[in-house]
Regions:
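Alpha-helical tetratricopeptide repeat
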Residues: 1-84
Length: 84
């Protein structure tokens, strides 16, 4: 198994244990991007953003900023492919 695929599997396992943890979805999005699966990566970014919006806990400003940047990148990709 490829190293990146193994990392995705580990991310999947971590998310299965704590699905409401936005940073895990962010991490999986990064690895999926490296694997070239932009659509799944963007789905994970959207999930992470949604989790942050629903969170009653203080939000890490760096995590929030990183997700905003990734979300913009996803929107740009959708615009370029004509799906947005």
């Amino acid at each position: 198994m490829d190293d990146l695929e193994l990392i995705v599997k580990r991310c999947d396992e971590a998310i299965e244990q704590t699905p409401d943890q936005a940073d895990l979805h962010r991490d999986r999005a990064l690895v999926l991007t490296l694997l070239g699966d932009q659509a799944k990566a963007c789905d994970n970014v959207a999930t992470a953003v949604s989790l942050l919006k629903r969170s009653s806990q203080p939000v890490d400003p760096m995590l929030q900023h990183e997700l905003q940047v990734r979300q913009s990148s996803c929107k740009q990709s959708r615009t370029m492919t004509g799906s947005d």
